[in-house]
Amino acid sequence: MDFADYIRTFNTGDDAVLVRDFYAPDIHFQSGPRILRGTDELLQFLNWAHDGIREIIRAQTVLRDENRIFAEIDMDFHATKDKPDFTFGALKKGEFTTVKFFVLYTLRDGRVARFKAATWPPNLGVTKPDSAAVLGAAPAQAPAAHLTQATATAPTRAPVAHLTGSPATPARPPAALASPPVTAPSQAPSGAPAQRAQPARSSAAERLGGTPEGRQAFMDYTRAFSNADFDSFSRFYTDDVRCELPSAVLERREAIVGFYREMFKTVRESLTLHQLIADDAGLAADVTSQFTAIEDAPHFVVAALKKGEFVRVRVFVYYTLRDGKIASIRVARAGIPSKPQRL
């Protein structure tokens, strides 16, 4: 599938053509808790969602391998009529709001067979549209995709960092347009704490990326994180690493270490990795994270937990890399947390 063609078609607002040309008949579509099956359900949903709303994709980052595309998207929602009950906040005709989406497309025979999306709160961490996008013009093309080596699709259990954070309030109200736009929108197994981390590897072995060694380095990083081996997992960061959670931003390596050193006194984190796309520019992970209380944690940000209880949540995590080290981390929830359960 040509993702640039997909974006161009999406941005025309012709949902029937989009569904006909780019989605498999048995598409499984999930956006947060909403699940749709088949192209008939999908088209019905798009017709409803785009009643009075023009939706424009502005792709910020695209990673892909043979059968998957991961995209970080700033999505502009333009109101073509008053929408007081709009999902992402009330809009009047001529107003727009922007929402950051993290989307994983799984392909089969050149069409989207599975679609999974997570979002940040409106206007949080987004770029501003240029004048062409504001007027509803489709971008000429998507950003160049990073081609990656295929990774195993079978779930792999490993701990991972930075999956906490609660939804934030909108960063700013919708911006009014000078003129209206053109009219045309799993369960992870529980278990005992992970084994102790292995001895520190050489700097060459710590280089993250799309090679088999680079993906193994990512597993080493997550293993060190799960074992609270702060010296080891922090070696995978650049000095100026930036971690963007839905509710907070952590600047620099020492801030991330300090945040998790405090958290790990009461709550430990592990995950089931469902899919990973990797190249030398970045890593995109679709995971279910499990948070387990080792002491009572009544104020834990995901859910209040008693000692021995755990909670799970599906998330997308996107890491950008610089010289084989993590330079930035962005996290988005792909569903609501489970209710606390006991091991």
Task: Identify the function of each model-found stretch.
Residues 1-343:
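C-terminal and inter-domain tail/linker signature
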